[in-house]
């Protein structure tokens, strides 16, 4: 396998968090093809990530953003349509962080990745939100060139 870097640019969005930026992501990350990378989305300390779902989106060059996944807890999460299981979410409540892990990095993973925080919702509301987000997504963005 040849070594090729994958660069990730991170942007964040938080609904209902007020006018000040409350999320932080490193501006870019890179890793070799075939490896696993973990993107971090950190919520400011005066907010509690434990009460939010973490949403992740991907935008490839020349394409609109697409919903990847929502993660609230190991027992309360959802994957976007046709999103492979090598994309997975997690949270570290003690560090106030959400994570997106991408295993077996592939060339097509080069994209912008968006992180967003939102209130926990029911499965029905989640399906409706996914449909709306596919039509007009609102999320933070991370670029993987």
Curated annotation (Swiss-Prot):
Disulfide bonds join 41-115. Only expressed by pre-B-cells. Keywords: Disulfide bond, Endoplasmic reticulum, Immunoglobulin domain, Signal. Residues 20-132 form the Ig-like V-type domain. Its main location: endoplasmic reticulum. Residues 121-130 have a biased composition (Basic and acidic residues). Residues 82-115 are annotated as: Framework-3. Residues 71-81 are annotated as: Complementarity-determining-2. Residues 57-70 are annotated as: Framework-2. InterPro entries: Ig-like_dom (IPR007110), Ig-like_dom_sf (IPR036179), Ig-like_fold (IPR013783), Ig_sub (IPR003599), Ig_V-set (IPR013106), IgV_Light_Chain (IPR050150). Residues 1-19 form the signal peptide. Residues 121-145 are annotated as: Disordered. Residues 42-56 are annotated as: Complementarity-determining-1. SMART domains: IG, IGv. It is found in: Endoplasmic reticulum. Gene3D superfamilies: Immunoglobulins (2.60.40.10). GO terms for biological process: immune response. Residues 20-41 are annotated as: Framework-1. GO terms for cellular component: endoplasmic reticulum; extracellular region; immunoglobulin complex. Interacts with IGLL1. Interacts with SYNV1/HRD1 (via N-terminus); this interaction leads to increased VPREB1 ubiquitination and degradation in pre-B cells, possibly through a lysosomal, not proteasomal, pathway. Associates with the Ig-mu chain to form a molecular complex that is expressed on the surface of pre-B-cells. This complex presumably regulates Ig gene rearrangements in the early steps of B-cell differentiation. Belongs to the immunoglobulin superfamily. This is Immunoglobulin iota chain.
């Amino acid at each position: 396998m040849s070594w090729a870097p994958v660069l990730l640019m991170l942007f964040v969005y938080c609904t209902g968090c007020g006018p000040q930026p409350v999320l932080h992501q490193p501006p870019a990350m890179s890793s070799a093809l075939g490896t696993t990378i973990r993107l971090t989305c950190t919520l400011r300390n005066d907010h509690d990530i434990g009460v939010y779902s973490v949403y992740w989106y991907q935008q490839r060059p020349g394409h609109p953003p697409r919903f990847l996944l929502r993660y609230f807890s190991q027992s309360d999460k959802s994957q976007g349509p046709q999103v492979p299981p090598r994309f997975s979410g997690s949270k570290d409540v003690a560090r106030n962080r959400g994570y997106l892990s991408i295993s077996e990095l592939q060339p097509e993973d080069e994209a912008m990745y968006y992180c967003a925080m939102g209130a926990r919702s029911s499965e029905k509301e989640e399906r409706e939100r996914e449909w709306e987000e596919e039509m007009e997504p609102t999320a933070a963005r991370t670029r993987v060139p």
